[in-house]
Amino acid sequence: MKITLPEFEKARVLVVGDVMLDRYWHGPTGRISPEAPVPVVKVEHIEERPGGAANVALNSAALGAHAVLLGLTGQDEAADALAGQMAGVKVACDFVRLADYPTITKLRVLSRNQQLLRLDFEEAFHDVDSTLLMGKVEQALPHSDVMILSDYGKGALNDVPSMIQRARAAGIPVLVDPKGTDFEKYRGATLLTPNMSEFEAVVGKVKSEEELVAKGLELVKRFELEALLVTRSENGMTLIREGQPELHLPAQAHEVYDVTGAGDTVISTLATSLAAGKSLDEACALANTAAGIVVGKLGTSTVSPVELANALYTEQETGFGVMSEAQLKIAVQAARLRGEKVVMTNGCFDILHAGHVSYLANAGKLGDRLIVAVNTDESVRRLKGPGRPVNPTERRMAVLAALGAVDWVVPFAEDTPQRLIAEVLPDLLVKGGDYKPEEIAGYAEVTANGGEVRVLNFEDGCSTSDIIKTIRERG
């Protein structure tokens, strides 16, 4: 499956659930306490991160989505710290603050990147009036593309059925990271993301792939779900739907340092990708890739679009296809992190011929990645006159993207790609024809950035205009 990143910034993600504050105390250990047989940690660094549902929202925001977080907290210092953390990453929070409860806080003591102890400060919100949070959900739903229910069993989601019903009535998909064995409360959700332990706690021990799929389908039917995504640690993840073959995605992690928050990354990437327009299969593939990245980090962490692009666009792959400008910028950043040389060219490419193919092949040999910027239909008409282009923008870009020499294809609406070139700033800008380098659009911007501009020769005897003329004469 060839995947490109969606425009995550268009996604509006509503996260509702058990919010937490994760605290980390880091320091060396060099002796045993004289008071008890335990190591003494000299705390040198204190760190705070959003946890639980807050980490889910943080992951969506890290991808570029507009994230809104709803949950229950206390009226305490930890709630203020959590709100400050979320404001810093531009997550809109609307908490129900309760005087008689502490904000759920987990304090971890670490030495040499090894966790020695965890202290939990919490009291489950089981007796809280569910209408307090439901009112905020109803206000947020009209401004959301997807809703995530992040259930850690702490009491914020004590009326899940009503939340699912309201969201589905509004046409908004609901993705649930479940907790416990009572899946009845998730009836009617779009998709559940249990891990293997949670799945087997509901259906019993699974002994084969066939049994996994069969029992997964039973859950899909029984609880009126659209899909079930079972995350299986080192065995990847499996998407199960009624009427379609299962989709198995192998694990992507190269090294596993910490699985803390990996489930949060999976559901947030999945939901954000769906909200940004990706299919369920594509969204699951992106979530699987994100999970492989995040388990290589210590503690609850996030994945950026550049990291995701870097993992998707490996050195061996090519032909990633048509992209928007936003997607292209992320892909270029990822390429540069890998030390790759980015080459860029542009043109109408109305009727692709041997001259074009030869030119693009030569351009591609000059670097590691080749970007082709293509004039839109309106731009071509202004430059070439009535009757052009023969092929619309989408078809021209699709043909170019299929060429082995071409990595990324992007449209531009202006007469020249100068603005786009200034945004991308390729290492090498090439153009075919009889130009002088300084006459080429984007020359000043590229050279000022330390890049190079080069003119390549076109193959003689190949011309789109001549091809069109010949067709008309013979027609």
From Swiss-Prot:
The metabolic or biological pathway listed in the UniProt record of this protein is: Nucleotide-sugar biosynthesis; ADP-L-glycero-beta-D-manno-heptose biosynthesis; ADP-L-glycero-beta-D-manno-heptose from D-glycero-beta-D-manno-heptose 7-phosphate: step 1/4; Nucleotide-sugar biosynthesis; ADP-L-glycero-beta-D-manno-heptose biosynthesis; ADP-L-glycero-beta-D-manno-heptose from D-glycero-beta-D-manno-heptose 7-phosphate: step 3/4
Enumerate the residue ranges of region (Ribokinase).
1-318
Does Nucleotidyltransferase appear among the keywords? Answer: yes
Q: Which residues are catalytic?
A: 264
Reaction(s) catalysed (UniProt annotation): D-glycero-beta-D-manno-heptose 7-phosphate + ATP = D-glycero-beta-D-manno-heptose 1,7-bisphosphate + ADP + H(+); D-glycero-beta-D-manno-heptose 1-phosphate + ATP + H(+) = ADP-D-glycero-beta-D-manno-heptose + diphosphate
UniProt KW Ribonucleoprotein keyword:
no
What name appears for this protein in its UniProt entry?
Bifunctional protein HldE
Species assigned in the record: Aeromonas hydrophila subsp. hydrophila (strain ATCC 7966 / DSM 30187 / BCRC 13018 / CCUG 14551 / JCM 1027 / KCTC 2358 / NCIMB 9240 / NCTC 8049)
The top of its lineage is: Bacteria, Pseudomonadati, Pseudomonadota, Gammaproteobacteria, Aeromonadales
